[in-house]
Amino acid sequence: MNKKSIRDVDLKGKRVFCRVDFNVPMKEGKITDETRIRAALPTIQYLVEQGAKVILASHLGRPKGQAVEELRLTPVAARLGELLGKDVKKADEAFGPVAQEMVAAMNEGDVLVLENVRFYAGEEKNDAELAKEFAALADIFVNDAFGAAHRAHASTAGIADYLPAVSGLLMEKELEVLGKALSNPERPFTAIIGGAKVKDKIGVIRHLLDKVDNLIIGGGLAYTFVKALGHEIGLSLCEDDKIELAKEFMQLAKEKGVNFYMPVDVVITEEFSETATTKIVGIDSIPSNWEGVDIGPKTREIYADVIKNSKLVVWNGPMGVFEMTPFSQGTKAVGQALADAEGTYSVIGGGDSAAAVEKFGMADKMSHISTGGGASLEFMEGKELPGVVCLNDK
């Protein structure tokens, strides 16, 4: 990682505008999952210990450029105070006189949470005037919001035009882990790509075919590949306009010497419910009025074996509709194989895969769980992330 981090700069007495990702799920004013707040703690604690004046900025939900009462960061600031064991102040604005006054009153080691940056229309437009307003509050910009690093917004990228810009500890770790996976992976290197749609994963599959030894396919997107092999897939998800692309990917894998794994058997159902009747069939035997919803037991065994014999595994996207118990076994089996694998470094690419390992109680067995769904996806596509490009080089 050739970007400067908070370890590379003097922070004592400095006003630090630290962009974090506190976009946590809320229900009736209560935080239902505080993973993202906890993920930011090491950076915040480091800034506090170094004697910085810590000004935290984040978005929450999609207020679309106006103040929305239930999307204020007040409950987040309160919970952060409990987790840090110290008084955390909350501003009702993200810039301007009120915020400036509160910043002016800060002592070294104090923590202030600004209001939801997406209450302002200029945030998502990366408006230069708004970025200047944010910058006016501080001496240094720290980006620790990997989950929003693929967005060129005023508080994630624009502000870096006006202040020295460095990464926080979470951002640094994400870039280190994902960067090493793509540039200098331990081998055998396996990528597991699941999820519903081929179109969401085209860039990732294309980019990874040049990097991996094994590519494992699962989830709804697998049925487009099954159909590309000439099999009937009943009512399973299929993107007919991507069948040629699926054929191309399978051919590319062959040419590049990549082992390409797709389901050999699947779990099928006639209805989507917790009590659904399911059957297990080979991929060439899906009846016309049934739908594939998970990978079958033979496939799970094959995939687990590949995982066990890999040194590095990157997993992005579930193997089936894991939210429903009858269709969750494939995703669970992949998670279990990663949890049990010895000497395998496992990288979970945020989003649904992270939610799945969390749900099955396997999170602590994974080597690295990315905090950015969209950001880790774009990073794995080989794209430059605006929230990273804007940081100062070492």
Swiss-Prot record:
GO terms for molecular function: ADP binding; ATP binding; phosphoglycerate kinase activity. One of its GO terms (biological process) is glycolytic process. It is found in: Cytoplasm. GO terms for cellular component: cytosol. Substrate binds at D21, F22, N23, R36, H59, L60, G61, R62, R118, R151. Keywords: ATP-binding, Cytoplasm, Glycolysis, Kinase, Nucleotide-binding, Phosphoprotein, Transferase. Its EC number is 2.7.2.3. It is an enzyme of class 2 (transferase). Pathway: Carbohydrate degradation; glycolysis; pyruvate from D-glyceraldehyde 3-phosphate: step 2/5. Disulfide bonds: none annotated. The modification Phosphoserine is found at S183. The modification Phosphothreonine is found at T299. ATP binds at K201, G292, E323, G350, G351, D352, S353. It catalyses: (2R)-3-phosphoglycerate + ATP = (2R)-3-phospho-glyceroyl phosphate + ADP. InterPro entries: Phosphoglycerate_kinase, Phosphoglycerate_kinase_CS, Phosphoglycerate_kinase_N, Phosphoglycerate_kinase_sf. Gene3D superfamilies: Phosphoglycerate kinase, N-terminal domain. Monomer. PANTHER family: PHOSPHOGLYCERATE KINASE, PHOSPHOGLYCERATE KINASE 1, CHLOROPLASTIC-RELATED. Belongs to the phosphoglycerate kinase family. This is Phosphoglycerate kinase. It comes from Bacillus thuringiensis subsp. konkukian (strain 97-27). The gene is pgk.
